[in-house]
């Protein structure tokens, strides 16, 4: 039951509200007005607003069964989120355990990908960053994965980066995310002598991706089905179901909803559907090197980004 009261009892207002499904009742006046109105309606309240595109959730599938392929950061966090919403999740991974490829790096940075405008696209990345930081902090309270919210410095190491940072600093909606730091401040914050200024993302963090993935799976292990050592050789879509087959044509799993979180291997699986699913997928190269600890570098207090990035020592290694 939804009840409203208003001093407005004009006929045009009452008729419009009646057409909208409300029961309008007139009551004796308060103060000097002749009539007041009270409105009642049994309804599920739906408020239409200026929702960002990523907040408009599609209607749920008729079946709560979902398959997620790939047990890295994307697959594990998606499985965790879906299980919290009551979905029956089957997580399929070709390796013997989770986070065996890029998500198994020793260290990963959590910092915003900023644009120089205020588009919905730019806002999405800001909100994703803020959510990720808060989610990691909450998860770290019950699971250990070396979460360090030290902040991160992005050096203004060339003219292009200096221009980008100047544009960032002029945007009001990101003012709380970063601050300009001089060369001297960079040295004080980082512990090393760098030759340029930069911006300091004060809420940014770094963590162990491998343990972060493991924490997600452990947090929902009672409500998801993990299938390791399962290589998905082919996808079939038959009668509303996605069916996954291994290299021996044995059925691995089937469900009406399929989520591919297996990096570049998704292009192989979707190749046969290119005519009906014309997705623009491309492989992005990435490379991380782990170096032995060095006495001077060991003084680094927080991650510093330039054309790449460098982290403090973790497990005796510098990333």
Predicted regions and their residues:
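Helix N-cap at the beta1-alpha1 junction of Rossmann-like dinucleotide-binding domains, i.e.
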Residues: 11, 96-98
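Rossmann-fold NAD(P)-dependent oxidoreductase module
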Residues: 16, 81, 215, 219
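Conserved beta-strand positions in the Rossmann-like core of class I SAM-dependent methyltransferases
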Residues: 90
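C-terminal substrate-binding/active-site "lid" region of AdoMet-derived donor-dependent transferases
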Residues: 1-44
